[in-house]
Amino acid sequence: GTQIGETVPAGEYQPTDRTHPRYENFPLCRFGAGSPERCFADSNTAWARYKELADQYNEPGVLTTFAAYEYSPVMESGGAEHRNVLFNGEDLPDHAISSLDVGSAVELWQGLENTCDIDKGCDFLTIPHNMNKGWGIFYSRWTMDGKPYSSEDWQLRQKREPIAEVYQIKGSSECALGLGATDEECGFSQVMEPCKEGETKGCAFNTSFARQGLKVGLQLEQELGFNPMRFGMVGSTDTHNGNAGDAEEWDFVDKAGAATSPAIRRLTLVRGDKPYDNNLKFHTSGGMAAVWAEENTRDSIFTAMQRREVYATSGPRINLRFFAGWGFDEGIAESVDAIAVATAGGVPMGGVLTPDKSAQKLDQKSEERSPTFFVWAGADPMDAPLQRIQLIKGWVDDHGKTHETVRDIACSD
């Protein structure tokens, strides 16, 4: 494997030995406001208030709220390995573990495992966030502090990270042209150019994008016997404005209030800024997270996220169902109970399609038969019509190299 300090091809993540500040050495307080320990303890009071607010506004069947926060270790040149931490249940931790406590995702998962006790009714998951500005770390084989993942680390990631954010106000993290993808749609909402030789920051890495992450998972499955990168995809706004789901382009209010401005300013580059640093021009209106849950409650939605029955959009409220099976007939599309048929004969989005039992009975290999898919999509009535439905296939060849192909399976007139 690659060692720290070795030269790697352009767009490949270079493991780096980073040292992160701990709260004891960080100027959390204003002068005269007390010791860092005092300010650190005060943060628990704020976290307790957020937990109370989540419970106060949670109304099963009407509005579901979760206690959650953003874990935000920073990297050089504005990069970050951010993750959203979302809790469910009772007896949640008294302290929100931050990047001043732990410097890597592995340490975060370990800390949360120790403080969120499933036996006491507490559960959690983490969601990779703003991956396109992670300088390749999210789907690399290395942690933030330059250490390789162990098998135990991968198992922890598999358990605690079932979904990933692929679209938000700072662009798309699904795929990028020139980074293992030839799909023209991968040029959508890109804010950085692919890395050139010698670049280690401020550019797009192949392991910053979800499609490559899924393919890395296939490689790891061959090596480890399990796939720690089996995840569903969601979108989000990341505006920090408190207006969840407000992703309309025609009513764009930008990020965090301070960046809001007239269109003429947003479309003007700031002299000397790199494109990805120009917050005004290179913001989208944000994305949406969709979850197929049995009911609008914490337990139902959280369980659906754990089983990865989720999808992302770049803002429109598109309806989407997707199933995989071994024997779907074309007539399913005309069936009045198509979803029930697909559910009975296959697995939904995020599921795992097991080997074909009928092929085993006939003493055939599952590889000799191809899986079948059922997909149904409906446009947002307040947005543009749907143009096409595509199926993207990723695989690993006999030499361990990853590939992907894109096929149109339905197109508009």
Give, region by region, the residue ranges found by the protein language model.
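A metal-dependent hydrolase metal-coordination microenvironment
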Residues: 1-142
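C-terminal functional module detector
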Residues: 39, 51-54, 69-76, 116-124, ...
